[in-house]
Design a protein with these regions (language model features):
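Glycine- and aromatic-enriched alpha-helical transmembrane segments of multi-pass membrane proteins
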Residues: 162-175, 203-226
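Hydrophobic transmembrane alpha-helices and their helix-loop junctions in integral membrane proteins
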Residues: 1-157, 169-171, 177
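Membrane-interfacial helical/loop segments at transmembrane boundaries in membrane proteins
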Residues: 102-109, 181-206
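Serine/threonine-rich low-complexity intrinsically disordered regions
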Residues: 72, 80, 147, 157, ...
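Intrinsically disordered or highly flexible coil/loop and linker segments, enriched in small
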Residues: 95, 146-147, 179-183, 222-226
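Acidic/proline-rich low-complexity IDRs
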Residues: 1, 193-195, 212
């Protein structure tokens, strides 16, 4: 919740890490061990991408972190902006990105295992995450510059900084397909190494409902941020 009102670029990302770690612990707590590990795996990609993007913004603005002073950076930093948006969509849980599959798998297991309270908190948290991440995106890259002197000299970062952003963004998009590979995808692969049996079965109707609800909640969060 601290990220909802914070204006420090790096602190918002740091606070978001806490909630994502919470999802991992929820996964383990409800018996969805492979889902928790999958979220750890996907989180490494999108959080690495987000922090590198924030570093690119800092480089362009001489270390400035206050997003209330930014705005209008999209036209000056298209690569950074687009890769930042990929990371934000990922952490918000928008399909078909991997963050959607890993987070929704955890929430689905929480629901079908009877932990409805935990599922509800996780779903609300997903909406909050979408809100504060896109609040950051809109304040940083869109609208008019709120500090014209700060923004007027901004420029895209050099290739040595933007190439890793592109590689991570493309890699992260490809990681999303790990969830839908044959034999259970990533989770099926992890399950082979787990001795403990996971809880939760295959409930197609419930799964479809939960997926739709999760996406709607995330889109509402993005809409409120806009």
């Amino acid at each position: 919740s601290m990220a909802l009102v914070n204006n420090d670029l790096k602190r918002i990302l740091a606070y978001s890490t806490v909630s994502q770690l919470g999802y991992m612990f929820v996964g383990v707590g409800v018996g969805a061990y492979s889902a928790g590990i999958f979220h750890l795996f996907t989180h490494a990609f999108f959080k690495g991408l987000l922090f590198l993007c924030s570093g690119s913004v800092m480089h362009a603005l001489h270390g400035e972190l206050d997003i209330q002073k930014m705005g209008g950076l999209y036209d000056k930093m298209k690569i950074t902006a687009l890769t930042f948006i990929v990371g934000a969509l990922a952490i918000a849980g928008i399909p078909p990105l991997a963050g959607f599959w890993s987070k929704d798998s955890i929430l689905h297991h929480a629901y079908v295992s009877g932990h409805r309270g935990i599922w509800l908190v996780g779903t609300i948290t997903a909406g909050m995450t979408a809100f504060y991440m896109f609040r950051l995106i809109f304040l940083t890259f869109f609208g008019k510059p709120r500090d014209k002197h700060l923004v007027e000299h901004a420029h895209e970062s050099p290739l040595i900084m933007t190439i890793p952003l592109i590689v991570l963004a493309i890699g992260y998009i490809l990681v999303g397909f790990a969830a839908i590979l044959p034999n259970g995808g990533f989770e099926g692969f992890v399950n082979k190494a787990l001795v403990l049996r996971e809880v939760g079965g295959h409930h197609e109707e419930e799964a479809s409902f939960l997926i739709i609800l999760s996406v709607v909640v995330a889109l509402i969060g993005i809409g409120i941020a806009y």
